Amino acid sequence: MIKVIKKKSHSGLKKRIKITKKKKLLRGHAYKNHLAASKTTKQNRQLRGVTCVKLCDYNRIKTLIRGL
């Protein structure tokens, strides 16, 4: 019998993506880890919270998080 290797989920991506009930992928915004003082208040406010993954990236990300 041939042993099939299980595909593993990308562990780095698992920590950064949340899946909703309707299978949408939520991610955090980029550009907010440091240097916030040089950005405007509006920029910092708009970078808070989460946003949905774009459709062009959805299929690529979905293959990386198979097990979830």
Swiss-Prot record:
Report the family membership.
Belongs to the bacterial ribosomal protein bL35 family.
Q: What is one Pfam family matched by this protein?
A: Ribosomal_L35p
Q: Which UniProt keywords apply?
A: Ribonucleoprotein, Ribosomal protein
What does UniProt give as GO cellular component? cytosolic large ribosomal subunit
One MF annotation (Gene Ontology) recorded for this entry? structural constituent of ribosome
Protein name in UniProt: Large ribosomal subunit protein bL35
Native species: Aster yellows witches'-broom phytoplasma (strain AYWB)
PANTHER family attached to this UniProt entry: 54S RIBOSOMAL PROTEIN BL35M, LARGE RIBOSOMAL SUBUNIT PROTEIN BL35M
- State the Gene Ontology BP annotations: translation
> Which gene produces this protein?
rpmI
